[in-house]
């Protein structure tokens, strides 16, 4: 797909929802292990690439070649899309190359015509992109060679034209924006990728708001308020993990 076929391509605006807000639900690698009943999740690049390619279609001709199979699903215009609380999915580790947990949310996503198979395909796509997160330093020829691994020409073109000098984790952002445009947005949902630096910024904002809410003024009282905040958020306070934030529109 030529990038000229796409109109109004713009870099996604920053997320305005703080991932530490009390109404945000959090999902971690431990939840994935509990759901799958596995102590170890294989998060190797080989596994990510394999599933990313399997979930794409190569049998048809035209603009659908190399794109996820879910993109061919027709949108149900008469469906009533039920809003749900934002879901924050933490990366499996502080190394984003290990990807994100694969957990489906039937009560929230089924009402948006997003099946377990669709969500699995998306997570596999993101995890495949995570495996390629270091390609920001590659040359153009090397990037284009990634098409053989299932990367669509759309993502590559978007990466080269829009992200190469303007964003961290360009391949991951390219994949997610493609899914938002082609699949999630028409179904009244949206996914943000929030890297660890952005998580740290949001945590600082959340801590400051907590301190202000407690009416702290001196250094000691601010320090105690910060300790209280960290204790309340001890399971999700790490800034080393990137996040996926799933919201309803």
From Swiss-Prot:
Q: Which UniProt keywords apply?
A: Cytoplasm, Nucleus
GO CC term (a single one): cell tip
The primary location reported for this protein is cytoplasm
In terms of Pfam families, this protein maps to: DUF4646 (PF15496)
Which species is listed as the source? Schizosaccharomyces pombe (strain 972 / ATCC 24843) (Fission yeast)
Annotated protein name in UniProt: Uncharacterized protein C1198.03c
Q: Where in the cell is it found?
A: Cytoplasm; Nucleus
């Amino acid at each position: 797909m030529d990038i000229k076929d796409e109109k109004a391509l713009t870099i996604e605006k920053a997320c305005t929802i703080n991932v530490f807000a009390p109404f945000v639900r959090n999902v971690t690698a431990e939840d994935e292990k509990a759901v799958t009943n596995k102590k170890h999740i294989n998060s190797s690049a080989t596994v990510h690439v394999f599933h990313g390619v399997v979930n794409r279609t190569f049998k048809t001709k035209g603009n659908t070649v190399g794109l996820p199979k879910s993109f061919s699903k027709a949108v149900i215009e008469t469906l009533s899309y039920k809003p749900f609380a934002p879901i924050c999915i933490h990366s499996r580790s502080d190394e984003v190359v290990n990807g994100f947990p694969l957990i489906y949310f039937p009560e929230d996503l089924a009402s948006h015509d997003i099946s377990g198979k669709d969500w699995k395909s998306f997570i596999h796509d993101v995890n495949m992109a995570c495996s390629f997160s270091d390609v920001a330093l590659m040359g153009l020829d090397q990037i284009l060679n990634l098409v053989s691994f299932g990367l669509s020409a759309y993502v590559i073109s978007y990466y080269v034209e829009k992200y190469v000098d303007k964003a961290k984790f360009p391949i991951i952002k390219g994949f997610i924006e493609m899914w938002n445009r082609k699949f999630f947005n028409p179904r009244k949902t949206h996914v943000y990728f929030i890297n660890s630096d952005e998580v740290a910024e949001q945590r600082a904002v959340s801590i400051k708001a907590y301190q202000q809410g407690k009416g702290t003024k001196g250094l000691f009282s601010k320090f105690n308020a910060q300790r209280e905040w960290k204790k309340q958020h001890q399971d999700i306070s790490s800034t080393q993990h990137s996040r996926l934030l799933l919201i309803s529109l």
